[in-house]
Design a protein with these regions (language model features):
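Short, charged, solvent-exposed linker or helix-capping segments at domain edges/interfaces
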Residues: 95-100
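Flexible, low-complexity linker/hinge segments
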Residues: 101-110
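Non-catalytic interaction-recognition regions
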Residues: 1-94, 110-595
Length: 595
């Protein structure tokens, strides 16, 4: 039973005894006492005045006095206007801690029976994953874990954007300047090689535009008439027509990229339950476009292009099929949404996509609604801010992007340098050290990104993220390692601290604070899931680690002479370490046994 429910239940008894009135505990308002007042939890008295026929102060004091006299778990009370602030006794906190320890599934919320699909990553197969993709992947993965922890059945999915004119640009550049290069012949990872071709296409395009302008053409026209751009569109038409030569090159280069993606995902600890490919889904969208034309929802212009007019809804006309018959990005989004809701009987669908696509998802939901799909209301766009570096925004076509692979390697090196400086790993094997460096580096990267509210644009600083002090992943990892070290020392001394039976002891103020914080874990999971914000869990883990370190600084745990108190303290910190593991596990971050 939660503290809130306990108070509501006992307050209901008090009201019956004092005013001979029946009131359901669920009808009473109980919340954590605000910091400026003295108390643990507060009961709102105002709604009870109709029963007491008295003032808020008299009513609050009467209920408080009854609770103090009849409920041993309540030690003190004070009434401020219409708010009854209650303090729990030592007995209550012992009992609550016992319940937490006994609950092997502590933190897991009841099963909802809901199916939720989370789409994230969704990269283009014309470049490697970069820092922006990392935020997307880490958000998508942690939100999926968070929704699962809150009782939902979660399907993690990605849509690989493996077709379109942007893919053809890399293919065309490879034909023009690639000289037959392969990952094997160059030693370059496949996704990086294809990314180099995308940058090369942009160089070719810029040169052609400059030449056209020099020949007297205006800039706007030149950008549309550049020969290589026309060739890329022609290649896309050939691809959609099934041209064997184009399809073979496409399959070959896509294979290079997908293999590279798999290596990057593995390094990040990212997996998917279902992978969709745009090349296999874009035709689904075309079927819906035909349906929309038949329904009169879409219109076909004289040039053959198909549009949805959303001006009456405060938006623009939206292109669905180009005049040359090729589809645009939203076309396949319509088709895949329909397929997913039918295939997985979804209750909701979360798209993790950057905030530059806010308009796109407004349009997507509106068009699906116009097509008669009521489930469109259950689509949620988890819009997040961009990741920036001191140099500013990243642009793939200019080759100024920070690659995910390079960043992961940099984090590994930062973790190694910081760990080696401490000199605490001298007796660890090189293999174990390498695993630890990867765990710390990845934990630093993930935590630094996830702790920021998804809606906010953020600046990533690798060196700051690896700091063993402050609000960082390594600080929490180090805290966990410190707890495990204390428990190992206890075992070496032959101290047993099995949680059952748990002795009831006089708890210190800091121990009560830790128990309070532990108790809020399920509520934090619910709060984070409702807001689609793993930052809630990240900051909870930091608060817990910070509170433990203060406790450890002030409390000589292993020097305690009272056996019951010593046992309680060891069980307390063991429980803390378990909750830290669970919280950080939601973020996809591992915690080491030693650092």
């Amino acid at each position: 039973m939660t503290p809130e429910l306990f108070i509501a239940s006992k307050a209901s008894e008090a009201i019956k005894a004092l005013y001979n009135a029946d009131i359901e505990p669920s009808a009473l308002q109980v919340s954590v006492t605000r910091k400026e007042f003295t108390g643990d939890f507060t009961l709102v008295v105002f709604p009870l005045l109709r029963l007491s026929h008295s003032t808020p102060e008299n009513t609050g004091n009467a209920i408080g006095e009854w609770l103090k006299a009849n409920v041993p778990e309540i030690s003190e009370y004070n009434c401020v206007k219409g708010f009854l602030n209650l303090l729990f006794s030592n007995l209550f906190w012992n009992e609550l801690f016992g319940e937490i320890v006994a609950d092997k599934d502590f933190g897991d919320l009841p099963t909802t029976g809901k199916n939720i699909m989370v789409e994230f990553s969704s990269p283009n197969t014309n470049k490697p994953l970069h820092l922006g993709h990392i935020r997307n992947n880490l958000l998508g993965d942690s939100v999926s874990r968070l929704l699962k922890a809150s009782g939902n059945n979660v399907i993690k999915t990605t849509l690989v954007n493996d077709r379109g004119v942007h893919i053809c640009k890399s293919m065309l550049a490879w034909l023009k300047v690639g000289n037959g290069a392969t990952p094997e012949s160059t030693g370059i990872k496949g996704d990086h090689l294809v990314g180099d071709m995308y940058v090369a296409f942009n160089d070719i395009y810029k040169k052609e535009v400059e030449d056209l302008i020099a020949g007297g053409m205006d800039e706007e026209t030149a950008k549309k008439e550049a020969p290589c751009l026309k060739e890329a569109h022609e290649m896309l038409q050939k691809w959609e027509a099934g041209d064997k030569e184009v399809r073979d090159l496409w399959a070959r280069m896509n294979g290079w990229v997908l293999k590279g993606f798999d290596e990057s995902y593995k390094a990040l600890g990212i997996t998917f339950d279902k992978v969709y490919y745009e090349s296999q889904t874009y035709l689904l969208g075309k079927e819906l476009v035909r349906k929309g034309l038949d329904m009169g929802v879409f219109v076909k212009d004289p040039d053959g292009s198909v549009w949805c007019d959303l001006t009456a809804d405060g938006l623009d006309r939206k292109l669905l099929i180009r005049s040359d018959g090729t589809s645009v990005y939203i076309t396949q989004d319509l088709g895949t949404a329909e397929r997913r809701f039918a295939e997985y009987h979804l209750d909701s669908h979360v798209y993790v996509v950057g905030n530059e696509q806010n308009y796109h998802f407004q349009v997507l939901k509106l068009i699906l609604k116009k097509l008669g799909f009521e489930w469109s209301d259950n689509i949620f766009h988890l819009s997040y801010g961009m990741v920036e570096l001191p140099e500013g925004k990243m642009k793939s076509r200019e080759g100024t992007v920070v690659d995910a692979d390079d960043l992961i390697q940099k984090m590994y090196e930062e973790a190694r340098a910081t760990s080696d400086e401490s000199g605490k790993l001298a007796d660890m094997s090189e293999e174990d050290k390498a695993k630890l460096y990867h765990m710390i580096g990845l934990g630093a990267l993930k935590y630094f990104i996830i702790k920021v509210d998804p809606k906010k644009t953020m600046l990533f600083n690798p060196k700051e993220s690896i700091d063993f002090n402050g609000n960082t992943g390594p600080f929490i990892q180090y805290t966990h390692a410190r707890i495990r070290s204390i428990l190992r020392k206890a075992a070496e001394k032959g101290i047993e601290y099995a949680a059952s039976p748990l002795p009831k002891v006089e708890l210190s103020a800091k121990e009560i604070r830790l128990i309070k914080l532990l108790n809020t874990f399920p509520a934090k999971i619910a709060e984070g899931a409702q807001a689609y914000s793993p930052a809630v869990i990240a900051n909870y883990a930091y608060d817990l680690a910070k509170e433990f370190n203060q406790y450890y600084h002030d409390t000589p745990i292993l020097k305690e002479e009272n056996e019951d108190v010593l046992k309680m303290r060891l069980v307390l910190i063991d429980t803390l370490s378990a909750v830290l593991r669970k919280a950080m596990g939601i973020l996809g971050i591992e915690l080491p046994e030693r650092m």
